[in-house]
A protein has these predicted regions:
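Compact beta-sheet-dominated globular domain cores
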Residues: 133-155
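An acidic, glycine-rich, mixed-charge low-complexity segment common to nucleic-acid enzymes
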Residues: 1-128
Length: 155
């Protein structure tokens, strides 16, 4: 797994934010799937600007009190779109997931996203909370039901 520098991370997330805005932001994708009994069932996933920060794996920087500082998901996304993101605006996740997410981010932010597998997540990994998973053996995206909107969104 490649370890990215902050400058490399900025280049990736700024470039991908432009594609995310064009391809997914404010849109829903409908996947039609078949189960082993050949029954067809739909999965609809919706994408919004406030989901982008989580997709990158980057975290808001911590303040002097050890709590996350005031960079919110929408602010982060707008800074990416405006090409104004700086190294001080984010941190890498301590568990290493940021680097994994940055490596696959350019491949999962397109409306022509193909998923070889879609299904319920079985909670087999203790630090991953999600309800639905869509992807392949190379990358996947987790989704949860947003209780306010009653839509599945990336988490």
């Amino acid at each position: 797994m490649k370890k990215f520098t902050k400058d490399e991370a900025i280049k990736i997330v700024v470039q991908c934010a432009q594609a995310y805005q064009k391809e997914l932001d404010g849109k829903s994708l409908l996947f039609l799937c078949t189960d082993k009994h050949k029954r067809v069932f739909p999965f609809e996933f919706s994408f919004y600007g406030n989901n982008y920060l989580h997709l990158t794996g980057l975290k808001a920087p911590k303040g002097a009190d050890g709590e996350s500082a005031g960079l919110f998901a929408n602010d982060f996304y707008q800074k990416c779109l405006d090409h104004k993101l700086s190294p001080a605006d984010f941190e890498f996740s301590e568990d290493g997931t940021t680097h994994m997410k940055l490596e696959v981010l350019p491949t999962v932010i397109f409306k022509n996203l193909q998923a070889k597998m879609i299904g319920d997540y079985n909670s087999s990994k203790p630090r991953l909370y999600t309800e639905k998973v869509a992807g392949s053996t190379n990358a996947c995206v987790g989704f949860i039901l947003d209780q306010t909107m009653q839509k599945y969104v990336p988490n």
